[in-house]
């Protein structure tokens, strides 16, 4: 009789302990995690995701371990004050967020990679390697995209190339052919136009001027290509000596377009080339009024007068380089 009482007491203790453990688990699972209206959990695709969760969000990791659920890497936002089990279920079913990724217009692949790296999991070095050399700049279309935060550098590069291909519709390709240019050549010319003018309104005029020179087989003599060849964008006044630089990008010495873009141009400038103005301008020079616009000329004599006015301004401002 005494033995039965002891067994019964032991069972009661075990049941109470189990109930207490279950209650504590239930409390942990149903307790709100976080206090902000919106916060995010970023689970990296590399390494041990369980260890990451256990270290940074142990209450969520406990639910996932207890349930035996899988963990999908990614960025989980709009969490607010949700209970741990609700967040765990989202992670276990991969209900992650797409992020907004603005891809800017930059002068190099390295600059693009540096701009994108803080927004996604991949680092700048791996992004730059995946995007390839600067010769591949024509395959990047600056725009704003939606992409998963955990995307690898290779996945990002593939996405950007796919977006660039999609941008080149049959109609745009037809326009390029009508100009006698390939897609790469259109982007190359657009990069020169963008470096030549920050004024989008005159971009089609600048594009038309360069197309006129190409048709007449004149040297482009585009100052931005010299700065690119010299590796110095800070130059304000190019000298005759600069025009002798030995580079395939020196359009003062080499006929036609350079071998590739001198920057990743904005799509608006690519459109400016595809829809270039038709006129008879062959020369241009920055206006001396600081407006950032250009004086266009049909004859060399008129161009010389425009250039002299600009050089006089540089002399007054003591800008010699």
Annotate each language-model stretch with its function.
Residues 221-263:
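Conserved SxxK-family serine transpeptidase/carboxypeptidase catalytic domain
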Residues 2-228, 247, 265-268, 272-280, ...:
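Conserved catalytic or metal-liganding residues and their short signature motifs at active sites
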Residues 284:
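Active-site-proximal loop/helix segment associated with metal-binding centers of metalloenzymes
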């Amino acid at each position: 009789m005494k033995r039965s009482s002891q067994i019964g007491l032991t069972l009661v203790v075990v049941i109470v302990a189990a109930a207490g453990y279950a209650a504590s688990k239930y409390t942990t699972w149903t307790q709100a995690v976080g206090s902000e209206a919106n916060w995010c959990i970023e689970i990296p695709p590399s390494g041990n995701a369980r260890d990451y969760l256990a270290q940074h969000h142990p209450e969520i990791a406990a639910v996932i371990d207890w349930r035996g659920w899988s963990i999908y890497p990614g960025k989980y936002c709009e969490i607010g004050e949700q209970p741990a089990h609700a967040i765990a279920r989202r992670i276990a079913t991969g209900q992650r967020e797409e992020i907004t990724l603005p891809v800017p217009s930059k002068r190099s692949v390295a600059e693009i990679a540096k701009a994108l790296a803080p927004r996604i999991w991949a680092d700048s070095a791996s992004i730059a390697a995946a995007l390839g050399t600067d010769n591949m700049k024509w395959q990047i279309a600056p725009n704003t995209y939606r992409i998963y935060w955990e995307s690898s550098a290779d996945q990002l590069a593939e996405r950007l190339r796919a977006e660039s291909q999609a941008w080149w519709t049959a109609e745009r390709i037809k326009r390029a052919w009508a100009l006698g240019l390939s897609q790469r050549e259109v982007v190359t010319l657009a990069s020169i136009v963008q470096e030549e003018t920050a004024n989008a309104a005159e971009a089609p005029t600048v594009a038309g001027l360069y197309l006129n020179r190409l048709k007449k087989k004149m040297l482009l003599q585009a100052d931005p290509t010299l700065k690119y060849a010299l590796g110095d964008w800070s130059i304000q006044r190019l000298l005759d000596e600069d025009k002798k630089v030995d580079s395939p990008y020196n359009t003062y010495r080499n006929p036609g377009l350079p071998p590739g873009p001198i920057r990743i141009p904005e799509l608006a400038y690519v459109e400016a080339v595809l829809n270039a103005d038709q006129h008879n301008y062959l020369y241009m020079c920055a206006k001396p009024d600081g407006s950032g616009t250009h004086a266009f000329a049909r004859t060399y004599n008129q161009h010389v007068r425009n250039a002299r006015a600009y050089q006089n301004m540089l002399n007054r401002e003591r800008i010699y380089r």
